[in-house]
Swiss-Prot record:
It comes from Latilactobacillus sakei subsp. sakei (strain 23K) (Lactobacillus sakei subsp. sakei). It holds the Pfam family HSP70. Belongs to the heat shock protein 70 family. CDD domains: ASKHA_NBD_HSP70_DnaK-like (cd10234). This is Chaperone protein DnaK. Gene3D superfamilies: 1.20.1270.10, 3.30.420.40, Actin, Chain A, domain 4 (3.90.640.10), Substrate Binding Domain Of DNAk, Chain A, domain 1 (2.60.34.10). Signal peptide: none annotated.
Amino acid sequence: MSKVIGIDLGTTNSAVAVLEGGQPKIITNPEGARTTPSVVSFKNGEIQVGEVAKRQAITNPDTIASIKRHIGEAGYKVTVGDKSYTPQEVSAMILQYIKKFAEDYLGEEVTEAVITVPAYFNDSQRQATKDAGKIAGLDVKRIINEPTASALAYGLDKTETDEKVLVYDLGGGTFDVSVLELGDGVFQVLSTNGDTRLGGDDFDEAIMNWLVENFKSDNGIDLSKDKMAMQRLKDAAEKAKKDLSGVTSTQISLPFISAGENGPLHLEMTLSRTEFDRLTSDLVDRTKAPVMNALKDAGLDANEIDKVILNGGSTRIPAVQEAVKNWTGKEPDHSINPDEAVALGAAVQGGVISGDVKDVVLLDVTPLSLGIETMGGVFTKLIDRNTTIPTSKAQTFSTAADNQPAVDIHVLQGERPMAADNKTLGRFQLTDIPAAPRGVPQIEVKFDIDKNGIVNVSAKDLGTNKEQKITIKSNSGLSDEEIDRMMKEAQENEEADTKRKEEVDLKNDVDQLIFQTDKTLKELEGKVSDEELQKAKDAKEELVKAQQENNLEDMKTKRDALSEIVQELTVKLYQQAQEAQQAAGGAEGNATDAKTDDGTVDGDFEEVKDDKE
């Protein structure tokens, strides 16, 4: 069975890992980095992903970042030129890039993956993530929650002990907290909570707003209206945030950020950690309620938690670490890298699926309650939040009016008492109900949630056994046909990218060969015949002509022809050098013989061995 890779598809950064020798290992990207920016840019018809795309963000308006914040969002599209892309398509570009360099590392095709999502993602967001994987050419074997993945990475070699673990996961765009029980190889999620609109991006924004306000106060210019200046501010804010995890103050210096009446203006400000903590205290405080709710739902007090694991790059912020310590009474565990733990845990789950990891069982939960709308617009729950999945639950309902021929089933997810305040997952209708007084027909509504947290709902008239089913699709509205079309486009893009790379490699080869030929011909002057030199020069000129005309097929043919001629000449050069060396060696030998004839006597010697040996 081929390897099942584990992918942490993050808001700001993504990572990929694979199980090797029973241990998960991060796969580095082509730049040698262990994480890859979740950024996509479009330039001259080419799609670029990762660090190269992030570097263009200031100058290239066709750059997309933090697309995960919109995945599963109905109707949301990003327009680039004359084309629009759904969040699934953009996410698929990131996944496709990750898939490619994972294949390069493993030396084999990768078709299966485990992808992580924030624990508090709803059904639409989970389904959309799965769709993104499919578009990228991946069979997503399992969707698992990010905090659960972290716990898998932490607890893989600790299966002998029983521990209650709280995972605090503050990433680039989302926040989750989960409480798990670990023991005998079973990883059971007791509860989960979070905020899908809170993350490191918000901390960056707080610094950006502070910079904008101060610059406006000093210079009377509002930088928020200058797109290029704002991108520079964003980069500087992110860097300052990271710096303040290690130092107590940092200098933010952005020359030529704007221009005033008297010429260019420069931004020079010092941000202290104290000021940063003041600017972001409300963001840190927003994470407290989910922590307390997760503990409450798990039926535990903070003092019953054995370990606190921090996950996500934003947990490096000292104020965050201090707050978690105060709320839980525990010093957070730093044994796993917060940027890599999720991908490592996903790789462990991949190993469970492929059979490489034995005796590990993962029991996850549904993050939000599921139910239907009933009379009066009330949300009636069938499955409560934090129920272990996979699970199934049925409940019987009846008609609201006499002789009602059909019932509309409105499927919802959320915690609010009224249907209108919760997230609609789907609607379907059960028809042909026999005429009967109100309350007589028996309609059984059944919910099934699979191990990925994806929902199936059925409604059955118990009198006639007529049944209607629905698999809840992503609210992004992607049909199977659209997904197939996007898969095809993604494949075409990959083929086009491969072709472009081959073109660049060919041009580089040609440049290198022309340079090498000039150098070799100079060395060969006077050492080979003029006829041979001219043959090489003519072949080189033909290649230069093909290069100038940008004729790729001609370039290949002429490159191969010139390469062969140069190789033959180089071999000749080496042969000549060798012959000269041998001739010199022969002359030296003759000189030695002559010396011996002059009366030098060769002496015999006998090796004397030491008796002590």
